[in-house]
């Protein structure tokens, strides 16, 4: 690359880096970012929802800066490195003459743009996908051991970022079958598995909680064409905006070659995989973001060779970029957008809540999103109490309850939460316009979310329930109650039925690590035809939680 062109490339890359650093520092966190920040407070080899890469990145960033920039800075640097890797994978000799045009093109890709300043699982996934493909390109050119280990390291890093990385790896291998016959490719896989062993061990010691949640426990909903399959195609458009026609054209018209075959196969595999998946679940926009990396290369390879599409592509990219620039300003200034987004008002509502509760710990009913957001902006302890109608999350497994056990806490929930049907609020605050939260005080917070409840035997009118006490200290079993949740085919709780423990001799001192075996009558109001059940245990006046796993049953009878 001529010196002047090289200088221009680095100037534009640094300008983009500077813009993203500014945006990262002035844009309030979105809820998922706050949740991942919470991960970073307790570094581990894994977390309930995701592998640990984001937590590591955020922890590193917090050593460098405070505030939102500290949370996001490593992701911003990864984004800049991603653009550099994409540029280096483009083989056209004329690319040095189109540096500004290249940056216009990559900046116009919606989520590649957004992950330039947001820290989400796809931020490292995009970077390590680019690193992986960069290594594959060189392994195909020069079948060397160094590139084999490079590819293996990148594969492991992808899997440490997000489980969807497996789709990328399979897409490359299945799409370009000759890789299977390469000894060094197998060495790369073995090296990746070795590097990934700590996370696999973490999954093993935590009963594969992440895999179980994503594959079986996660609630779903009935199929709807508009939100499932049609929504999938809308998400594809959202990836590329007005450049989509030229993206599709490039997928078909890019010149042949081993590496281009790899890239095309990856795009086709990812799109096909999630298209088929759209008939069983809603496809989130970011799930297909990995196609941005191979697409960025393929489109620019064609741009350098096909003069007919250049103007059309750049005009489309410019229109999309203008929309994205306006949206990015709108993330900072709420008045610019017609809707309220997650980056608006978080410091304000957490400050209002802080004014009501002072330095007391805050327990949020059913919100792993609000709890870390409050802790990030206001400090102190917060916790998500997950009831039967909600879902498990990191607060379910990390022992954070012990930090506030027995303390005076403020419990808060939206004003329309079912909890307020039987409890009177003691204070309120506005989270946003027309979004009021109520709260009350609990002098000695006690909740047993780690009890394991299971239905081990069912007769026509009775059942045997086992409750396993996992804590290292005794508890008073007379303070607990049992609820039976009736779930539908999509694991959503449709009805909660109190399950009377009358006649049971519950101990005042329930010894640590002990198991209670209860013989209970069939709950009243339970119909015979059901899709499944879930047990929950509550304590005092606090609602039943997620102590039991979903169990498929068609009737109450055995």
Residue ranges with predicted function:
Residues 24-36, 45-57, 65-69, 207-209, ...:
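Extracytoplasmic catalytic/substrate-binding loops of multi-pass membrane glycan-assembly enzymes
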Residues 42, 114, 138, 145-162, ...:
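Membrane-interface alpha helices of multi-pass inner-membrane proteins
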Residues 73-95, 108, 131:
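Transmembrane-helix motifs of polytopic, lipid-linked glycan transferases
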Residues 92-96, 132-147:
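Membrane-interface transmembrane helices that cradle and orient dolichyl/undecaprenyl
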Residues 102-110, 155:
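Short helix- or helix-capping micro-motifs
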Residues 114-125:
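Short acidic/glycine- and proline-prone juxtamembrane loop motifs at membrane-interface regions
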Residues 157, 167-260, 272-275:
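Transmembrane-lumen/periplasm boundary regions of multi-pass, lipid-linked membrane glycan transferases
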Residues 311-359, 367-383, 387-388, 411-415:
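Membrane-proximal, lumen/periplasm-facing interface regions of secretory-pathway glyco-
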């Amino acid at each position: 690359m001529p010196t002047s062109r090289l200088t221009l490339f680095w100037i534009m890359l640094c300008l983009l880096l500077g813009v993203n650093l500014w945006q990262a520092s002035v844009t309030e966190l979105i809820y998922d970012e706050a949740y991942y920040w919470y991960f970073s407070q307790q570094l581990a080899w894994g977390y309930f929802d995701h592998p640990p890469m984001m937590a590591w990145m955020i922890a590193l960033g917090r050593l460098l800066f405070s505030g939102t920039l500290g949370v996001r800075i490593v992701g911003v640097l990864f984004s800049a490195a991603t653009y550099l890797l994409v540029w280096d994978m483009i083989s056209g000799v004329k690319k040095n003459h189109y540096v500004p045009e290249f940056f216009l093109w990559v900046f116009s890709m919606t989520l590649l743009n957004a992950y330039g300043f947001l820290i989400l699982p796809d931020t490292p996934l995009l970077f390590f996908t680019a690193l992986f493909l960069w290594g594959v390109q060189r392994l195909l050119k020069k079948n060397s051991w160094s590139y084999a280990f490079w590819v293996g390291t990148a594969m492991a890093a992808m899997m440490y970022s997000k489980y969807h990385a497996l789709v990328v790896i399979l897409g490359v291998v299945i799409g370009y079958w000759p890789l299977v016959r390469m000894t060094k490719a197998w060495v790369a896989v073995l090296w990746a598995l070795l590097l990934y062993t700590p996370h696999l061990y973490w999954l093993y010691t935590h009963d594969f909680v992440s895999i179980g949640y994503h594959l079986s426990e996660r609630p779903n909903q009935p199929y709807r064409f508009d939100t499932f399959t049609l929504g999938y195609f809308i998400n594809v458009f959202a990836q590329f905006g007005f450049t989509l026609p030229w993206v599709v054209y490039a997928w078909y018209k890019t010149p042949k070659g081993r590496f281009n075959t790899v890239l095309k196969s990856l795009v086709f595999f990812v799109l096909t995989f999630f298209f088929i998946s759209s008939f069983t679940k809603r496809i989130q926009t970011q799930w297909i973001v990995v196609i941005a990396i191979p697409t960025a290369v393929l489109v620019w390879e064609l741009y350098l060779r096909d003069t007919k599409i250049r103007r059309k592509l750049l005009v489309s990219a410019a229109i999309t970029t203008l929309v994205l620039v306006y949206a990015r300003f709108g993330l900072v200034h709420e008045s610019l957008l017609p809707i309220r987004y997650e980056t608006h008002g978080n410091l304000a509502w957490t400050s209002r809540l802080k004014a009501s509760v002072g330095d007391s710990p805050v327990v949020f009913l059913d919100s792993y999103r609000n709890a870390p957001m409050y802790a990030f902006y206001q400090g102190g302890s917060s916790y998500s109490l997950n009831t039967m109608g909600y879902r498990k999350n990191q607060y379910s497994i990390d022992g954070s309850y012990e930090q506030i056990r027995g303390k005076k806490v403020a419990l808060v929930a939206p004003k329309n939460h079912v909890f307020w049907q039987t409890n009177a609020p003691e204070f309120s605050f506005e989270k946003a316009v027309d979004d009021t939260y109520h709260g009350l005080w609990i002098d000695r917070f006690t909740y047993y979310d780690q009890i394991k409840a299971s239905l081990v035997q069912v007769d026509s009118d009775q059942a045997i329930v086992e409750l396993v006490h996992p804590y290292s200290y005794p508890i008073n079993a007379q303070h607990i109650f049992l609820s039976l949740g009736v779930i539908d085919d999509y694991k959503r709780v449709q009805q909660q039925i109190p399950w009377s423990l009358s006649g049971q001799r519950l101990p005042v001192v329930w010894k640590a690590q002990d198991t209670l075996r209860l013989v209970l009558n069939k709950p009243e109001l339970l119909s015979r035809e059901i899709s499944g059940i879930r047990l929950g245990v509550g304590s005092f006046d606090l609602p039943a939680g997620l102590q039991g796993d979903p169990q498929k049953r068609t009737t109450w009878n055995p």
